[in-house]
C-alpha cells in the first residue's frame, strides 16, 4: 500500500465456513494491510450448509474464530451477522463496517446458497427453493452493492468483487437455479461497473471452478463411498491436474482489491485451472 493511502477497509460476506473462500479472502486482505469485517448469516455459516469434512472441522470457531485468528496476526478485524437477502440486514452490515472502521473501500460478495440436491429435476423444483437461491446469490449481491456504493462514492474510491462461479459462464446440468443466479451475478457486475466507472469504483467478478472447500468435500461424499477417489476424479478433469484452493480464489480477489487494479473493471475472471477458456 502506498504510504499516502488510507488504511483500506474490506467487508466480506460468507465467512463462517470451514475451508471456505470467505475466510481465505479475509486472510489475504488482512495480510495485505486491510482492516477486515467478516460477515455471515450465522456464526458458523448457514445451518443447512454446515456439512464439514469430518475431523478437519474440529475446533473450527466460525466467525469468532476468524476474528481471533486475524487479530492474533495483527489485523484490525470485526464480525457482523446478517442475511444478505434481507434489505435491512444488507444496509446494517455496510453501516457496521463504516461505523467500526470509519470507511468502506472493498466489498466482497461471497455469500451463496447452493441448489438443494433433491430439487435437481426441473419438474421437482418448488418455487420457494428456486427463489431462495436467487434471493441469496443474486438479490443479495445487488442489495450489498447498493448499500456499499454510497460510502465508496463519497470517498471517490472503491472495489467491489462479486464471487460468481464457473457455473455462471456455462451450463450446469440439474443446477438451473444456481446456474441462473451465477450468470446473473456476472451480468449485474458488468452493468454496475459502467454505472460507477466515473466514481473511482471498479466492479469485477471471480468465477471459481472446482475448489477444495467444505461444500465440495460434502458433494464428493454424497457422490461416492470413496471420497478421495471422487476428489481425484474431479481433479483429473481439470487441465492443471488438481482442484483449486480457497487461497487460489483469494489471490484473484487480492488483485481486484488492490490500488493497481484501477483500470480493470466489468470483468469476470475464471479461477478454474483452465477448464473454461472462452
For the regions a protein language model found, what residue spans apply to each?
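Short, small/polar-rich loop/turn modules that mediate ligand/substrate recognition or access, typified
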Residues: 197, 202, 239, 264-266
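Canonical Rossmann dinucleotide-binding motif of NAD(H)/NADP(H)-dependent dehydrogenases/reductases
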Residues: 2-39, 43-44
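Alpha-helical segment proximal to the catalytic Tyr-Lys
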Residues: 150, 169, 194-198, 262
